[in-house]
């Protein structure tokens, strides 16, 4: 089939950047957007200007009640109830569920009532099957109507863990992600439900937080189930995060051996997904980078032949958004 037609539910950070990634790559067509909290003129403004990734390099305007990007008209809906969005009328076959609210099969399934054929949840899901490009995307099949693209951190960790496990075997490992702030955090101290620390001022603190990212790797790489877990530190940077994977290896390996296999993977089967660098990089060097994960050869360290700390960078917004687009293109190739 030709390019798949896509609707986006929730025009937040990921919704807008999936839209940018779609136009940049040309792999899918965005035909509809739903957001009850943003009107059309505001959508134009929010899409055009971005404090993190800069101004959109193209044209964007409102015309005849539609959002027109690079001359392509996009139907706009403002429904709160996902079951009432007329995706079918707009020609949307797939829906990116990027509100962060409808992350279960049941809730995300509401989109199917409006004529969508498949739903891609741009967040981890409690019950939807999770797919990570380069890791288990080949396991996707046509019987699945609702899937999840997992989290940005799982997309960073899983490709690296796969390469290490395939070559040396991971006995067990702990992950820490030093993670940029996201929209769920507070600018100054405020109330935050059950997780009190999460309500502390994002600009003033390093905040320990939970993440299911490492455990989720066990869902996309079954052999690693129960072998990885981890946590996060939220730090006062706007974007770009870094994974620190400390793991025990089954087969002995020199650090140079590890560098070699990761570099090979980055130039071969995982090209465009897993990057490799020996440069003296810092986080801002990865702003707007499209890789899921970039291995930092110079930052890692080995204690001995069986125990290593591996470092990998990721643009938690844009790298992830590009994988959502890639996953949809992969699904479309299986129709």
UniProtKB/Swiss-Prot annotation:
Residue numbers covered by motif [IL]-x-C-x-x-[DE] motif: 245-250
An annotated Gene Ontology molecular function: peptidyl-cysteine S-nitrosylase activity
Record-listed NAD(+) binding positions: 13-14, 35, 80, 122, 316
Record site: Activates thiol group during catalysis: 179
Keywords attached to this entry: Acetylation, ADP-ribosylation, Apoptosis, Cytoplasm, Cytoskeleton, Glycolysis, Glycoprotein, Immunity, Innate immunity, Isopeptide bond, Membrane, Methylation, NAD, Nucleus, Oxidation, Oxidoreductase, Phosphoprotein, S-nitrosylation, Transferase, Translation regulation, Ubl conjugation
BP-aspect Gene Ontology terms: antimicrobial humoral immune response mediated by antimicrobial peptide; cellular response to type II interferon; defense response to fungus; glucose metabolic process; glycolytic process; killing by host of symbiont cells; killing of cells of another organism; microtubule cytoskeleton organization
EC number of this enzyme: 1.2.1.12, 2.6.99.-
Positions of post-translational N6-acetyllysine modification: 61, 194, 219, 227, 254
Catalyzed reactions per annotation: D-glyceraldehyde 3-phosphate + phosphate + NAD(+) = (2R)-3-phospho-glyceroyl phosphate + NADH + H(+); S-nitroso-L-cysteinyl-[GAPDH] + L-cysteinyl-[protein] = L-cysteinyl-[GAPDH] + S-nitroso-L-cysteinyl-[protein]
Modification sites for N6-malonyllysine: 194, 215
Residue positions where Cysteine persulfide is found in the record: 152
Regulation of catalytic or functional activity: Glyceraldehyde-3-phosphate dehydrogenase activity is inhibited by fumarate, via the formation of S-(2-succinyl)cysteine residues.
Involved pathway(s): Carbohydrate degradation; glycolysis; pyruvate from D-glyceraldehyde 3-phosphate: step 1/5
Domain notes: The [IL]-x-C-x-x-[DE] motif is a proposed target motif for cysteine S-nitrosylation mediated by the iNOS-S100A8/A9 transnitrosylase complex.
Protein function: Has both glyceraldehyde-3-phosphate dehydrogenase and nitrosylase activities, thereby playing a role in glycolysis and nuclear functions, respectively. Glyceraldehyde-3-phosphate dehydrogenase is a key enzyme in glycolysis that catalyzes the first step of the pathway by converting D-glyceraldehyde 3-phosphate (G3P) into 3-phospho-D-glyceroyl phosphate. Modulates the organization and assembly of the cytoskeleton. Facilitates the CHP1-dependent microtubule and membrane associations through its ability to stimulate the binding of CHP1 to microtubules.
The protein's name in its UniProt record: Glyceraldehyde-3-phosphate dehydrogenase
Organism, as annotated: Homo sapiens (Human)
Gene: GAPDH
């Amino acid at each position: 089939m030709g390019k798949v037609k896509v609707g986006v539910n929730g025009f937040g950070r990921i919704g807008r950047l999936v839209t940018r990634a779609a136009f940049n790559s040309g792999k899918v067509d965005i035909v509809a957007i739903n957001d009850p909290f943003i009107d059309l003129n505001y959508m134009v403004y929010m899409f055009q200007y971005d404090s993190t990734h800069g101004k959109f390099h193209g044209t964007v305007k409102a015309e005849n009640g539609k959002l027109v990007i690079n001359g392509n008209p996009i139907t706009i809906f403002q429904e709160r109830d996902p079951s009432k969005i007329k995706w079918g009328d707009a020609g949307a076959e797939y829906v990116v569920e990027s509100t962060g609210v409808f992350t279960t099969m049941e809730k995300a399934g509401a989109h199917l009532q409006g004529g969508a054929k498949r739903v891609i949840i741009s967040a981890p899901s409690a019950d939807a099957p999770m797919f990570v490009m380069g890791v288990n995307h080949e396991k996707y099949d046509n019987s699945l109507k609702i899937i999840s693209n997992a989290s940005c951190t799982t997309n960073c960790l899983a490709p690296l863990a796969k390469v290490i496990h395939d070559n040396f075997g991971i006995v067990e490992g702990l992950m820490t992600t030093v993670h940029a702030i996201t929209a769920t955090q507070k600018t100054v101290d405020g109330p935050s439900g059950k997780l009190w620390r999460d309500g502390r001022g994002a600009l003033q603190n390093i905040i320990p937080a939970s993440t299911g990212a490492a455990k989720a790797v066990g869902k996309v790489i079954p052999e690693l189930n129960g072998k990885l877990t981890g946590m996060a530190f939220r730090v006062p940077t706007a974007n770009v995060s870094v994974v620190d994977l400390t793991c025990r290896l089954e087969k002995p390996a020199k650090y140079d051996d590890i560098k070699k296999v990761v570099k090979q993977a980055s130039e071969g089967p995982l090209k465009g997904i897993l990057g490799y660098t020996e440069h003296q990089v810092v986080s801002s060097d990865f702003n707007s980078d499209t890789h899921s994960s970039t291995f930092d050869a110079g930052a890692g360290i080995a204690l001995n032949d069986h125990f290593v700390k591996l470092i990998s960078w990721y643009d938690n917004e844009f790298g992830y958004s590009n994988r959502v687009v890639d996953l949809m293109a992969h699904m479309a190739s299986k129709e």
